[in-house]
A protein has these predicted regions:
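Acidic/polar, glycine-rich intrinsically disordered N-terminal extensions of enzymes
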Residues: 1-103, 265, 270-272, 276, ...
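Active-site cavity-forming subdomains of large catalytic enzyme subunits
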Residues: 3, 9, 17-22, 27, ...
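Function-dense linear segments that define catalytic or interfacial modules
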Residues: 56-67, 78-155, 159, 163-169, ...
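Internal maturation/activation junctions in enzymes
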Residues: 251-252, 367-390, 394, 398, ...
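Catalytic alpha/beta core of large soluble enzyme barrels
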Residues: 332-333, 379-380, 462-465, 475-482, ...
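Short, Gly/Pro- and small/polar-rich lid/capping loops
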Residues: 473-475, 675-720
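Short, cysteine/histidine-rich loop/knuckle motifs that typically chelate Zn2+
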Residues: 831-836, 850
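Cysteine-rich micro-motifs
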Residues: 844-854
Length: 857
């Protein structure tokens, strides 16, 4: 039985509104406070309440002066205790006065105008990308407009490098343009965190470069700043099912040069409908061959993702005014060129009715309209990187109201994720939120006007809008609607941690509790720090406190451990000072406070215990009530059969409501698959696969390790490219005179064969080669570095080094022990902020369980 909506709405404000009160939010988890301090705190703000107060005032400032305080108080109430968590850019930027930033998490851009495939157009789009990244926004676009590899270019008399090669320009620029430097400031003027650009690129299944696109990230280091998705049409999926042929094709540039210049915009169906000619590049006897290639890449490497583009456009509320071919980086917003993703989430842990073992619908009815108004105001309050994006925001007024804490809330109610009861509750919840949000938007239209592109007849005829309750549709017909789209299930990596560590978005609880380990650059006051440590003899002294340390063994390593300030502290020879704390999901804390926690109960199942069907059925149920899209990762075990994996994607397509699918198969992020010059275009060579080394930039981040091997003290320098070991140098400590406290720096390549070290503490060493004791040492580091650059398995390198004998033994062991620390980190995903391997992949985004860094917010 679906829950009926009513017309109850927040009361009309009086002309004399009361002063705005301060919120009273409390962190119950130290991890949440750290995420606030590192990610959202602005300048000298005292706490989360000051941030929320500024956000509420700022978002209410677009209201009429006489009611601004009324709505500011409503927004304070909404934000208080994390009942509603705005998108990360709103929490971070609203109320700061920073005019170069935006409140919008992501933007979809793309080529426009005439001659879209020209170098001028490409450079124009790169300029747009730069402005989006500079403003802290994520970036998405479709590469369909780019001509295929090998196409003759008349103007230069040569061949085009193709769409995938050109993407390297976007990839490189994304690595350069970040918001933040990583340097500490003496004055607290702004934020504490570097925000790196997130990107999504899409390419259609008909494009002649699609095979190269599918295999692009199987080459180590290639297009690492992109998420990649293939646009799959209904026609292609039917060809796969019915074993029909499939042709890769592109406009006939020579046969319709003027039409190509004026009318080619990447929409092949539109091009062909106008009668313009195309060129067939390759025909697969069966479309399933190409589908199999895509599925194998996704199975083995988790990329590219798959987007069902016809489903996206058929269910688009603005089907009559726009065409969609791209998404934001995490896929929860399917958008046209110029589109923006304005995000916010209802925290379901604050809307549970424990007595009824159900959702608190009356409380939801109160707060959903306030959340819709809050988000609608952002369209008027936020800056945008480019004028066309601001125009898009105000013409369409899209918002993306979502949920977080879904998995935690179910666990609070003792309902197993994916169970029949959970699905029934989810169906009722989805319908309720959808109808309440649309009615709230219609109320706003009555007060403030409908969005400018609203066409009543066409809008109400839309496939998604027809799913609304008759009363809701009648309300829209009478008053119009303020926002073209209202709903989106987004990644909430940082946001869910900020909200006292609830589960993210639609995901189940990843782990009920776990140990968080964080490298500490400085010791807190009162903690004694080990010094003069002899790891073999197990002797040390301490400075700075009275803490008592004890020796323990983890694996084959000796470590020191103590307890201080309700945490376990460790000290090891490669990572230095470490802090360990126990992190618990919000639902676990809730049950512990009631004395009802039972980790063995069926309702306490986490992501590790769930079946694939639990994920897919949950997605299918909620997708019926979401007008934009959902960012949700289907986690599958390492031994999940490939044929069942393919069937999973076909089943998702057949729902007709899920707009895309992303999966993560356990253990598959590691593989750096061998690629040759021809394998990137889909051809396979026999014999031993050869990989091309990733080019070395002039400067590499460097981690500095000090250790003892067979009685000799060594310093090992590991150069890192995108967080992975790229090169290594090792020399005796007494030749370097480098303090053991120095842990990080930069390896600078001055010229071929000459490398200099500049540490973060200001030490500088010129020409590292001069510090080797012998030619054998230099030769061995060269060979190890060569193997690393070509993607050799680190575990294999370590095993070979440990077999060394003779005079080189101590030197080889020192390098082996150092590289051993990187084995597990390479075999899993590593955090780009702290290099932790303690990572979860959910909702299409990576979240570090140690430092809280999230690729998506």
């Amino acid at each position: 039985m679906l829950i009926e909506t009513t017309t109850a709405r927040p009361s009309t404000p009086r002309p004399s509104s009361p002063p705005v009160r301060k919120p009273q939010t409390i962190f119950v988890d130290s991890f949440s406070k750290e995420v606030f301090d590192q990610t959202y705190r602005f300048a000298t703000e005292s706490d989360i309440n000051e941030r929320h107060f500024k956000v509420a005032l700022d978002i209410a400032s677009v209201e009429r002066p006489e009611i601004q305080n009324f709505w500011a108080n409503k927004f304070v109430d909404l934000l208080e205790d994390f009942k509603f968590v705005p998108g990360g850019r709103i929490t971070s930027n609203a109320g700061t006065g920073l005019k170069g930033t935006t409140y919008i998490n992501c933007f979809v851009s793309g080529f426009r105008g005439e001659d879209q495939d020209s170098m001028t157009s490409i450079m124009d789009e790169l300029r747009r990308q730069a402005f989006i990244l500079k403003s802290e926004g994520g970036y998405g676009f479709c590469a369909d407009v780019l001509r295929p590899r090998g196409t003759f270019v008349n103007g230069i008399g040569g061949d085009s490098p193709g769409a995938v090669k050109l993407l390297e320009m976007w990839d490189t620029q994304s690595g350069v343009i970040t918001a933040g430097s990583g340097l500490e400031r003496k004055e607290k003027k702004g934020k504490n965190k570097i925000r790196k650009g997130a990107q999504m690129v899409t390419l259609s299944i008909w494009h002649p470069d699609i095979v190269e696109f599918i295999g692009a990230k199987q080459t180590a280091g290639r297009l690492t700043k992109f998420n990649m998705s293939v646009l799959v049409s209904d026609r292609f999926m039917k060809a796969v099912e019915n074993q029909l042929p499939w042709t890769l094709e592109f406009p006939d540039i020579d046969g319709a040069r003027e039409e190509y210049r004026k009318h080619w915009d990447g929409n092949l169906d539109s091009w062909k409908a106008k009668g313009y000619p195309v060129v067939a590049y390759k025909t697969y006897e069966k479309a399933s061959e190409l589908w199999d290639l895509l599925m194998k890449s996704t199975y083995n490497r988790n990329e590219p993702g798959v987007l069902f583009i016809d489903t996206i456009n058929k269910l688009n509320n603005l089907y009559y005014a726009e065409h969609i071919n791209a998404t934001n980086p995490c896929g929860e917003q399917v958008l046209p060129v110029g589109g923006s993703c304005l995000l916010g989430s209802i925290n379901l842990t604050k809307f549970v009715n424990s007595k009824a073992a159900d959702w608190d619908y009356e409380k939801l009815r109160t707060y959903i309209p306030i959340a819709v108004r809050f988000m609608d105001n952002v369209n008027d309050r936020s800056q945008a990187p480019l004028p066309e994006q601001l125009e898009n925001m105000q013409q369409k007024r899209r918002i993306g109201l979502g949920i977080l804490g879904y998995g935690s809330a179910l666990m609070m109610l003792k309902v197993r994720y994916g169970s029949d009861k959970a699905l029934k509750m989810t169906e009722e919840l989805g319908s309720f939120i959808m109808n309440e949000a649309y009615r709230a938007s219609a109320d706003l239209a009555r007060e403030k006007g409908a969005f400018p592109l609203y066409d009543a007849d066409k809008y109400l005829a839309g496939q998604f809008v027809r799913r609304l309750q008759p009363e809701t549709r009648a309300h829209i017909k009478k008053h119009g609607i303020r926002n073209s789209h209202l709903l989106s299930i987004q990644p909430t990596g940082n946001s869910s941690v900020l909200a006292n560590n609830v589960s993210g978005g639609l995901e189940p609880i990843f782990m009920a509790e776990y140990t968080r380990t964080v490298i500490q650059p400085f010791a807190p006051s009162g903690l004694a720090v080990p010094t003069n440590v002899n790891w073999s003899a197990k002797t040390f002294t301490t400075t700075g406190g009275t803490s008592k340390w004890e020796w323990i063994k983890e694996g084959d390593e000796n470590l020191l451990r103590t307890r201080f300030d309700d945490a376990v502290w460790k000290f090891d020879q490669s990572r230095g000072l470490l802090k360990e704390t126990q992190i618990k999901d919000f639902a676990v804390r809730y049950h512990e406070s009631l004395g009802t926690w039972d980790s063995r109960a069926d309702w306490a199942s986490t992501a590790y215990n769930l079946k694939i069907e639990d994920h897919v059925r949950t997605m299918e149920v909620l997708s019926r009530f979401v007008d934009a899209a959902m960012s949700k990762t289907v986690n599958v075990p390492a031994d999940y059969p490939y044929e069942e994996f393919k069937r999973l994607y076909m089943d998702v397509f057949k729902t007709g409501t899920i707009k895309g699918c992303t999966s993560y198969r356990e253990g598959t992020m590691t593989a750096v698959l061998a690629a040759t010059s021809s394998s990137s275009t889909g051809e396979e060579l026999s014999g031993i696969p050869r990989t091309k080394a990733v080019s070395r930039p002039k400067s590499l981040d460097c981690e500095i390790h000090t250790l003892t091997s067979d009685g000799h003290k060594w310093v090992v320098l590991v150069g890192l490219l995108d967080g992975d070991p790229y090169e290594v140098f090792a020399m005796k400590q007494n030749r370097l005179h480098l303090p053991s406290t120095v842990k990080k720096g930069q390896l600078l390549k001055e010229k071929p064969g000459r490398y200099n070290l500049l540490t973060d503490d200001g030490w500088a060493l010129g020409d590292i080669r001069t510090f080797f004791e012998s030619d054998e040492q230099e030769a061995l580091t060269r060979m190890i570095s060569t193997a690393l650059r070509h993607g050799a398995d680190i575990e294999f390198i370590v095993s070979q080094l440990l077999k060394s004998e003779g005079t080189i033994n101590s030197f080889a062991k020192a390098i082996a022990r150092t590289l051993k620390g990187y084995i597990k980190e390479i075999k899993t995903i590593r955090c780009s902020e702290c290099n932790s391997k303690n990572i979860k992949l959910q909702e299409g985004c990576f979240t570090c369980l140690d430092c809280g860094s999230s690729k998506c917010e």
